[in-house]
Regions:
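Ser/Pro-rich intrinsically disordered low-complexity regulatory regions in eukaryotic proteins
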Residues: 1-2, 9
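Conserved mixed alpha/beta catalytic, RNA-binding, or beta-rich assembly cores of soluble enzyme
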Residues: 11-295
Length: 298
């Protein structure tokens, strides 16, 4: 199905950020939800040499909020807010300085709290990147609307991404392929933020029965997922019947945290129907890892 969008009315602007170093945290040990203290690798920011969209979101030893790829931000607060607002998932990213100058990648997601943007590059590009390298993004997607579905609000989504997500219609509603469902009772860190346009919200994996019921062991970075009974139109609000679609941007975390979801589509009236599809992943839909041996979901 061809989505009717107002993309011809959207402004495309250039924003830029610098590759940020991985960040430390006071104290080496942190307590996991099961009560076991661990020395954790702080997984946000920096350059990940062997973690990319399409890889498992869980199972990485001693990691907290592990993100894929490369993260960028700006040292100036106002400029960083602009970067986080205007960069949209699926936008083109171009290395503007350093040894990898001219190489291209893709915007994957945005992370609240640290306020940075996550990018995907091919492994051979990653090897030539350094902290401080500047990345420019052709920001396109702010103001996007679905003309036939006014209740469904796109957020942080490049129009080209929505065209590749295999979205359809059924009985007057959008059908969106996702890998997993997330019930409202799991939503954790991020609730209370006034806007879903510039970050993410976590869902908790601390209950073993729920973890097993929803099959989260197969969760992958870049998976498209559906949050049930949550409306992200004006912040993260519980509302029965609402449905939100987002992308997994990081792995598990300490109590109250968990894998993060950057919002792509939300409907307070529930005019989105999630359809389970194990292949509903950012890397798969955009063909980012063609030629690589495909690993099975666990």
């Amino acid at each position: 199905m061809a989505l009717k969008m107002n993309e011809d009315k959207l402004a495309k602007i250039l924003v830029m950020g610098e590759i940020s170093h991985s960040m430390g945290h006071p104290g080496s040990f942190h307590v996991w939800p099961d009560g076991v203290p661990q020395v954790l690798l702080r997984g946000w920011a920096g350059i990940k040499l062997n973690v990319r969209v399409g890889d498992p979101a869980l199972g990485w030893e001693g990691t907290d909020h592990l993100e894929p790829g490369v993260t960028i931000r700006n040292p100036d607060h106002s400029s960083n807010l602009s970067l986080n607002l205007h960069a949209c998932v699926g936008n083109e990213a171009i290395v503007a300085s350093g040894d990898a100058k001219g190489e291209k990648g893709t915007v994957v997601a945005k992370h609240s709290g640290i306020e940075h943007v996550i990018l995907d590059f091919a492994p051979e590009v990653i090897e030539n990147l350094l902290f401080g390298d500047k990345i420019k993004i052709k920001a396109f997607g702010v103001g996007l609307r679905l003309l036939d579905f006014p209740d469904v609000k796109p957020m942080s989504a490049d129009p080209g991404l929505l065209k590749k997500m295999k979205i359809g219609t059924k009985q007057g509603k959008l059908t969106v392929p996702v890998t997993h469902l997330i019930p409202a009772q799991l939503i954790g860190s991020g609730v209370g933020e006034v806007s879903a346009y510039t970050g993410d919200v976590d869902f908790q994996l601390s209950d073993p029965a729920t973890f097993e019921e929803y099959g989260y062991s197969s969760l992958r970075l870049g998976d498209f997922v559906a949050i049930l009974d949550y409306d992200h139109s004006y912040g993260y609000a519980y509302r029965q019947g609402a449905v939100t679609i987002g992308i997994i941007l990081h792995g598990d975390g300490t109590a109250g945290h968990g894998p993060g979801v950057t919002t792509l589509l939300t409907s307070g009236a529930g005019n989105i129907v999630p359809v389970i599809d194990p292949n509903a992943n950012f890397a798969t839909r955009l063909g980012l890892r063609k030629g690589e041996k495909k690993s099975k979901r666990r």
